[in-house]
Amino acid sequence: AQNYPKELLDIYVIADNCTDRTAQIAASAGAFVYHRYNSHQIGKGYALDFLFKRLAEEGKDDYDGYFVFDADNYVDPDFVKEMNVTFGSGDYAALTSYRNSKNFGANWISAGYGLWFLREARFLNAPRMKLGVNCAISGTGFLVTGDVIRENGGWPFHLLTEDIEFSVNCALKGQMIGYCEKAVVYDEQPITFRQSWDQRLRWSKGFYQVDY
């Protein structure tokens, strides 16, 4: 639960090619669930684009902003409240948060990821925020304004690293991405070398796609 008026929040869950009980569990908890089945267009970017376009078609796209989370995230109770403080300035097209690790102590691999995201938060996004230059979103735990979604006609970012693709797009358009250090989201990290290798390889390919 969030320390924020619940009547001001709607929760949407995209059951993307789901074969488990995700949709039923989410619906029973009060979320609006949208089912998507597509074996060709795979990835978070396509799922987000599907939802935003459905909301526009149904006349439900008048939100001030959208938070994006992964299914395995734990969101700090003050997350929305803290993000809203920074969002209220009206200066930002998007906001990123402090992406912490849910399983930091599992082993050296998950701990390494935790240190990586600490470095990203404290030594990249925090200084950029102080200097008034663009930060970058990182996969999950971020906020995008409704104006940006409507301007883009959804979420047209489908590379393997769609978060970096979006961040670069904002920079090219002169749209600012801010950072809210007090808003914390806990993300589950890989615990095996193979999981880490596959993820890092996917990220590397995604970086190349953005550069290309």
Each model region followed by its residue ranges:
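Short, acidic, metal-binding catalytic loop of nucleotide-sugar glycosyltransferases
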Residues: 1-8
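Catalytic donor-sugar/metal-binding loop of nucleotide-sugar-dependent glycosyltransferases
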Residues: 132, 158, 167-185
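Acidic donor-binding/catalytic loop of UDP-sugar-dependent glycosyltransferases
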Residues: 21, 69-86
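Active-site donor/metal-binding and catalytic loop motifs
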Residues: 181-196
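Long helical/loop segments within the catalytic core of UDP-sugar-dependent glycosyltransferases
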Residues: 35-60, 78-160, 197, 201-212
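Short acidic donor-binding/metal-coordinating loop in glycosyltransferase active sites
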Residues: 63, 71-73, 162
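A conserved acidic beta->alpha catalytic loop
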Residues: 15-23, 38-40, 74
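Short aromatic/hydrophobic "clamp" motif used to bind/position activated sugar donors
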Residues: 66
